[in-house]
């Protein structure tokens, strides 16, 4: 090697060291930020729960009903002191409630049903048993059934997921049979699924053994509907693809002659599906994966985040979502409200169920909930109101009505609504007390505020039921025809002095929440007057009570920040709010629509604000919101913490999103503030927080670690093979990595990765990549694209829609380079340590020369290897998964490397080659481990049925044969120019596949490695034939 080559080599090594160090620092920083606790609206706030659980196993559900009876079990939950326990003699013949089935998730327990089941029983027996007014008169307690899957790994193994779905369909048939002797036997059950249990519930409906109409309501908790969380198993992806297609066809409005589509329409038409997700606190599953997307229309379901559910207002981690006190209260209330014991389905109609679900799980500010508002329906029951014009306080547009204890401007405060043709207006009301009912028997001294939407009348019949606000001194009468809209009030978190967390006013909190109502012109156009009446109670000692109401111009309450994503990233956004700002203002940020970016908002006030004599009745708070999915977060007491970290779930990698203007996906910030007269919020600054954005990459790109690291190892092999072809010496793996870091190569790689992000979202290119994907070529039903043109799905490379995030690819590559370098050095150190210990042990054994020269030991070992290979190839097709053989192959290769290290004088080329091969095998290993975990788990529970998938011995045969051939420490044979080009072309395609397809089709990385081993075998046998011909 000349001095110029040595200089380049030293430069490459220096760059490699620098880049690897930077990559490891970046990786550590990302992991540190991910494990650091969350604050503000993203901090945990669940309360502890208590219950008295008991479980009765239903032994009658045995092999005569299902072939899975020896593996799975069915239980009935009973709350001690509440639910009657089954009699030993009568068994389950006299069940009197409504059947509901709980499905645990990946490695979940049947006992996880206890929290929601206990709360449902408590609410029913404490509140519903006597059927008081205001509660569902047709409600009945639920009989909670739950499946014991022995903590099966449904996220790892597609066949296991199908087994569970098939078992549960048979379980539902059995459960309904338990009620056969009831006076009104049910024909369906409610399904409650956690994690992968929610996916199982969707699979159930698509199977042949599904009983028509046996499921009509599904509630899922943190269930990955939009995408499979792990892609180590091809069966999982096939199931997702088939089930998604079934559900899409079931709700597709297009006429079709397809038999499966017709079946899907019949089965799904009356099913409601609600997907509840815990948001950012879920450290196991990306919350983006829980969206329903194009699978379920708004008439049949929606996705909602727990941060926006009234009274919950907290993100919830993956396991806590089944026991969180606030959420279980909401879920239990919803279950009891949809119950209709008089119906054969034991629930109300789809329309009423959806209305109940929207009221229980959505914040009430969404346009989607307008259809459920009293003001929207304009009910037939009206309130006729007779008022004294002298007692009316007319509140002008833009003027705030302020009511505090004992201080009511007038018994009747009236907002006159302009014609919608003249101007669009918005009415906002905020109160520390719930909106009360206006009663006809008492028109004085109301202790709760009342809100009415009215139309002015000319006359009222004398015999009509009138609420009269007039007296003997009244000279001018004004008459109104009104509706009471108290049911339209939305519970929101308290934001006052001394309030620092959302949990303080959530369900079970020490402080009372606030209540708000907001109407736009779409609803207000039906009326000409808004009336606020009632006081906050003269006798009230709570001086913190208040009511604020305002009618404002709609346009004055809407602001747009026009900066795009690139502008927000580079310079941020800054703006000031007007002096005459309304009670609530919505700020739309069209450029902020990415799920993998965090945003920092800073609110600043004038310096002299604290010196003013005006005392706000509440502290400024922010409602952060977005639609599809419905995500709301509340940031309270902004004065105490004026810097807010905003995380959102908008357009996310690998999940379908509706094709529409990006502005419609933008983040919305609604600021509620009690304005100081003639003062203004000085500035609001918004910028992208790149540091906190790093933590958002972990869950969404955990599989990218494998694909990027494998691609880097393969790139190193490309340069190693090139050097071997030129010099007939196989260089070290470090040489391959240093070649990657040569300035020209490294720059080219970073440039390529940078342009991959923007071009991979181009639709024609996506269609082409889909066509040439070997997974799609194998099965045309497994597509990487959305099933409908109304939605878009980015499945390739990093799955990004944001062209401004071109740098994410290079960042991952730098991280991967650091991880691969660390892996190599760790492997080398571990190998040398083990080799040194082995050499010492061999010396101490003091083997005699006679023992060393035993006749033909190699032949004996060769025979054993052949027997071992034959045994493995025999058991794989009938019992063991091929992943077991791969793990054994990795162990064999590790031993092979140690043997080479022990033989200190061995040719370095052999060591370098085998060490590089071991690096590749070890990074492919994680793809195979999950299936092996499922296999071992089945063995531990004495599930004697042979493993039902992954028995293709061809998927491992080349690997086994190559390991057997390398038992004598061989290296690559000499290659002709043609074979060299084929080898390099295959390695290049392998790199391409890992980067473009590898994250969502990870399991195919193993199959490509298997093909690589097959090609290496061809090279060896061809070289052997050439040698034989030469000898002859």
Curated annotation (Swiss-Prot):
GO molecular function, one term: phosphatidylinositol deacylase activity
Annotated membrane topology: Multi-pass membrane protein
Superkingdom: Eukaryota
Coiled coil: none
UniProt keyword annotations, A-Z: Endoplasmic reticulum, Glycoprotein, Hydrolase, Membrane, Protein transport, Transmembrane, Transmembrane helix, Transport
GO biological process: endoplasmic reticulum to Golgi vesicle-mediated transport; GPI anchor metabolic process; protein transport
Cell compartment(s), UniProt: Endoplasmic reticulum membrane
Residue ranges crossing the lipid bilayer per the database entry: 15-35, 703-723, 740-760, 805-825, 861-880, 884-903, 916-936, 943-963, 985-1005
Entry keyword Membrane: yes
Pfam families for this protein: PGAP1, PGAP1_2nd, PGAP1_TMD
Glycan attachment positions: 12, 520, 555, 784, 907, 938, 942
Active site feature: 195
E.C. number: 3.1.-.-
A cellular component term, taken from the record's GO annotations: endoplasmic reticulum membrane
Stored PANTHER family: GPI INOSITOL-DEACYLASE, NEGATIVE REGULATOR OF VESICLE FORMATION-RELATED
Function per UniProt: Involved in inositol deacylation of GPI-anchored proteins which plays important roles in the quality control and ER-associated degradation of GPI-anchored proteins.
Protein family: Belongs to the GPI inositol-deacylase family.
Protein name (Swiss-Prot/TrEMBL): GPI inositol-deacylase
Lineage: Eukaryota, Fungi, Dikarya, Ascomycota, Saccharomycotina
